[in-house]
Amino acid sequence: MFGEGSRDNATLSKEGLFDKLEIGIASDITIRDKWSCGEIKKPETINYRTFKPEKGGLFCEKIFGPTKDWECCCGKYKKIKHKGIVCDRCGVEVTLSKVRRERMAHIELAVPIVHIWFFKTTPSRIGNVLGMTASDLERIIYYEEYVVIDPGKTDLNKKQLLNDAQYREVVEKWGKDAFVAKMGGEAIYDLLKSEDLQSLLKELKDRLRKTKSQQARMKLAKRLKIIEGFVSSSNHPEWMVLKSVPVVPPDLRPLVPLDGGRFATSDLNDLYRRVINRNNRLKAILRLKTPEVIVRNEKRMLQEAVDALFDNGRHGHPVMGAGNRPLKSLSEMLKGKNGRFRQNLLGKRVDYSGRSVIIVGPELKFNQCGLPKEMALELFEPFIIKRLKDQGSVYTIRSAKKMIQRGAPEVWDVLEEIIKGHPVLLNRAPTLHRLGIQAFEPVLIEGKAIRVHPLVCAAFNADFDGDQMAVHVPLSIEAQLEAKVLMMAPDNIFLPSSGKPVATPSKDMTLGIYYLMADPTYFPEDHGGKIKIFRDVTEVLRALYTGGFLDERINNRCDETGRGIHIHEKIKVRIDGQIIETTPGRVLFNRIVPKELGFQNYSMPSKRISELILQCYKKVGLEATVRFLDDLKDLGFIQATKAAISMGLKDVRIPEIKSEILKEAYDKVAVVKKQYDDGIITDGERHSKTISIWTEVSELLSDALYVEISKQAKSKHNPLFLMIDSGARGNKSQLKQLGALRGLMAKPNGAIIESPITSNFREGLTVLEYSISSHGARKGLADTALKTADSGYLTRRLVDVAQDVIITEKDCGTLNHIEISAIRQGSEELLPLKDRIYGRTVSEDIYQPGDKSKLLAKNGDVVTSAQAELIDDAGIESIKIRSTLTCESRRGVCAKCYGLNLANGRLIGLGEAVGIIAAQSIGEPGTQLTMRTFHLGGIAATSSTPEIVTDNDGILVYMDLRVVVGQDGNHLVLNKKGAIHVVRDEGRSLEEYKKLLSTKSIESLETYPVELGVKILVGDGEKVSSGQRIAEVELHNIPIICDKPGFVKYEDLVEGISTEKVVNKNTGLVELIVKQHRGELHPQIAIYSDAGLTELVGTYAIPSGAIISVEENQKVDPGMLLARLPRGAIKTKDITGGLPRVAELVEARKPEDAADIAKIDGVVDFKGIQKNKRILVVRDEITGMEEEHLIPLTKHLIVQRGDNVMKGQQLTDGLVVPHEILEICGVRELQKYLVNEVQEVYRLQGVDINDKHIEIIVRQMLQKVRITDPGDTTLLFGEEVNKKEFYEENRRTEEDGGKPAQAVPVLLGITKASLGTESFISAASFQDTTRVLTDAACSSKTDYLLGFKENVIMGHMIPGGTGFDTHKRIKQYLEKEQEDLVFDFESESECAC
């Protein structure tokens, strides 16, 4: 029913491909005359004896064409010579049988039937056109009630519903001919046909103008949009009612014979059969003048049969087939993973491909892969046949195939020849990023397994425990050229997500190199000898391998055994005119290092190898880097073999201090237990403190063990230390479990079990410890299975939202920018500025601070790594850069705003699919992380820092802090958003320091953000020295501290209602706890200046769950604890929390228990309590403006009366709602918030993703605006439109002298943004297929095929990469005389030119 002239309205481009596609509602005439080749009258399919299609049935050859090529049904005409003849006996046209895939038919319906999509898909199109509710429509369509079509002389209203009794009453009163009332599809058809859309449109516009109610306006605007769609398109509303049903070609719903005389059939045949049977029965009934009740029932059944055909289960119970399974309707054919879109159009199976298990191929070069001979023979068969024919070895294809099967010697020679220079693609599923498919030169090998180079394993995430890979052969010259130039493994040695090398040695290779480059362990002076000095590298190698020396004078200094030198001996050697102190191992390693990098004279853990590869690429280019990588691989394997490093049980040392530390910990836990028993602390605090004690023990023992095995390494390498320190395998956490203790474990629900596993794997676990241990291990495995699916779905949504972001131009010329600075946590720099600005375009000139003559980077420069270093070293805090968030390209983004392509360090090229790269960069580590949880076996990973210690000498300065001096003379912090700074002692006054810090004129040595309740041990402006404790952090409670002296009075702390006394079972001590209640009580502690409680000096709201620490009428001093709110048990931090957090951010969901944020800058005040909510007011003292916040009493406030707050600052605990940031702080702040929050999740797991990828996703989430005032434009109130469309419409209106529209930016989640894309084909293939198609058809949408997805679906070349317009124009076509060389692969260079 869709696609009125879809192909007719499409414009054909030069290559015969259409460049746009229009969808519409098909009219009755279109179905009958344009699509159909005949009417189906019988429900029969095939004859049970002859197995031939029945005439006039669902497989009729007369309608659909012959079942055999060039043969009619009765056999009168056979062979191609009768082409085009229609047989006079059976009426079948003599043609190809494949027409049965194209020819459609139709079923002529006895009564009009409503198309289910148009009234059941929300919003109901028919309901909106007629202005009727869905339930009313349903009663009419399913023959329950009549609807008045023409009231005539009666007092009825048009569209009024009448039940049977009312209808009879009206007929009796006025007579049958006085009015028209009908039911079913016929009634809807008449109503739709009589609807005057133009006047309805005018009326709706008038109502929209007059209506003030926001909700009514939204409702009207939605209806108006649907009506406008019909008016502006060529669709007629009555086409939503069918008079004939189109029938799908028979080869798309086949009937396949099975063994044993049974048949397998498509569900569609059953559904069509039901429709035909009911339709034929209804026709017969109507001819017989049957009673109305029976006719009505039959009509309803026909409506239901057609409903089931189009969308089974949408109305009523689904129609079941054999085995009680719902039948698959036409809608199901399109929907979901196995629907037409995703199964057949976006993903296709390809020929010329094979699959096999992979094994390691250490002998291969970086650009090679080993291909089993048998597989290659099969894959390259057509090429072999052509070459054999060209050589004259065979003359027919059949004889060539026989020759191949025989395995004749010339076949192998030809095969060797053909695969030279013919790359193949290797792919490992799941293909999480573009490095999952790479091209290699095949090398023929024996056996049946594919061989893979060890260094590409990281990119494929492959190992050799049974992994399989698929091989694909690029056939055309263009495909081969692309594979060779763009996809070869040596071109893919850097990650597109971060620019870090991905092809770095790992495991054995790292171990071998680390062993070779280890610090000297043999010192000749310790053995009474002298350091040997060598003339050059050759001499060192000769001494190392043969034990001989070129010079007799050196021979005298040979070691006692006379065997030359040890690989880790300290020696001196002359290199490039300089004498260097090094080891023979390092000399050996430096033979493979490119000269330009200089002599590498330090140990080589994996991190440093990675840096060396990056440096190598920057200095000497790709070719030399790839050679260096291959040499690294060979050297690494050789040295690992020679070193013969293996681990023994004795190598796992148990720290001597273990028993002592454990005893101490048990004592501390006992103290905490005693405090709980005495009622000093709550159960939650006891739990938190216990866990902190064990976490500290864990870290202490882990460090002690590491020190112990590394100490031992000075004289002799401990293999365990070698493996961990080199980065080859294992980490400190695993070492801790082997030699110290397993530590705290988590329950399956994430809570931490209090008693840790104090044994380690060397000692062995007790039965109880083993069972606790298995908890964690199982949780890890279960999580992995579940989260992999989540992560895959996230990647899919990300790809969908960003798929059409491509680089469309060099420079958009924008003046907009974003500002970025280093990311810090306290005084620690998590991500330096240089890493954030590398590869980005600066949008202002950057000078050396204080020296305008020294230009570090020019406006419009793309920052190189050298420039980034200079800018960072100059101490510049933040710089302005261009970003995809501010790019003004009309479609896609520009190269300047994007910056460098991280995969090759060059400016990004036109046509690059940066959106998909961004989606893969964010999605791929998500999957990696979920797969990585179980490696720690569910160990609780918590962090605790109960104190702040300074590393510098200087002056301590408080910034934005409200403090009170406690009884012990220490300063207690009363607000949340403050910090303490350690600054260099320059002899200034405290005020000067504060002023300079606030204007960023001086930089602090250390900065520590401090929370409410932190105890600062040093006064403001006092001197501190390195190693001094400057503050203590309360980890377990949020304290409520008194800041004024006075006497306590409880307010609304009513026992049994707002508070309860809890008796500690162990001690009998009573604790007063504030509980949640529904009454009008608002628990608070008031402080009065006098014992008579007459003058109020302050009130403190007490949240539920808090434990009150003071008694009524008690005298209190500043700094005293009034109450404490336990922070609750610590849950383990894991990406399990991280992945849903990323999804929550990119889907723009409102977080549970969201925080309130300040809407204006001002001072906090409280205005009492109303309906169980506290009224918090932020007052701007300059303008007098006030903003009220109603905050539930159960929420914990993090501000107090008198605090200064900034716009957007949190007032209560919890996560911030992104939509509120947008509304209050604007688009820039929201963009910054989203990018930083997503980065935070990945940073916690040590995953490096460049900001630009997240920025692209955020850009896609913010591409729409909501109309607040349509002005004189054609836009509607409340409508969400694309920014570009909005600006374009406003420009047109202003040119015509009209008033432009006003709008506010909208934040959409990625799913919603994907469905809101301009291309209906892309949206339909993502989700909600039926709704998207219905929507598009009603307004006759046109898809201009601009994105990737829609082009893949239509079978066109994608408009990206080499398919991008600019590149397509460059493509040269082969001349006629060269055409025969296309498959002559030796002449590849001639063709490629």
Curated annotation (Swiss-Prot):
Co-factor binding comment: Binds 1 Mg(2+) ion per subunit.
Subunit organization: The RNAP catalytic core consists of 2 alpha, 1 beta, 1 beta' and 1 omega subunit. When a sigma factor is associated with the core the holoenzyme is formed, which can initiate transcription.
Organism: Chlamydia caviae (strain ATCC VR-813 / DSM 19441 / 03DC25 / GPIC)
Similarity field: Belongs to the RNA polymerase beta' chain family.
Names of required cofactors: Mg(2+); Zn(2+)
Gene name for this UniProt entry: rpoC
EC number: 2.7.7.6
Catalyses which reaction(s): RNA(n) + a ribonucleoside 5'-triphosphate = RNA(n+1) + diphosphate
Top-level class of the enzyme under EC nomenclature: transferase
Residues that, per the record, bind Zn(2+) 1: C72, C74, C87, C90
Keywords from the named record: DNA-directed RNA polymerase, Magnesium, Metal-binding, Nucleotidyltransferase, Transcription, Transferase, Zinc
Binding site for Zn(2+) 2: C812, C887, C894, C897
Keyword Zinc: yes
GO annotation, biological process: DNA-templated transcription
Function of the molecule: DNA-dependent RNA polymerase catalyzes the transcription of DNA into RNA using the four ribonucleoside triphosphates as substrates.
InterPro entries: DNA-dir_RpoC_beta_prime, DNA-dir_RpoC_beta_prime_bact, RNA_pol_asu, RNA_pol_N, RNA_pol_Rpb1_1, RNA_pol_Rpb1_3, RNA_pol_Rpb1_3_sf, RNA_pol_Rpb1_4
NCBIfam families to which the protein is assigned, alphabetical: rpoC_TIGR
Superkingdom classification of source: Bacteria
Binding-site list for Mg(2+): D463, D465, D467
Keyword Coiled coil appears in the UniProt entry: no
GO cellular component, one term: DNA-directed RNA polymerase complex
Name listed for the protein in its UniProt record: DNA-directed RNA polymerase subunit beta'
One GO molecular-function entry: DNA-directed RNA polymerase activity
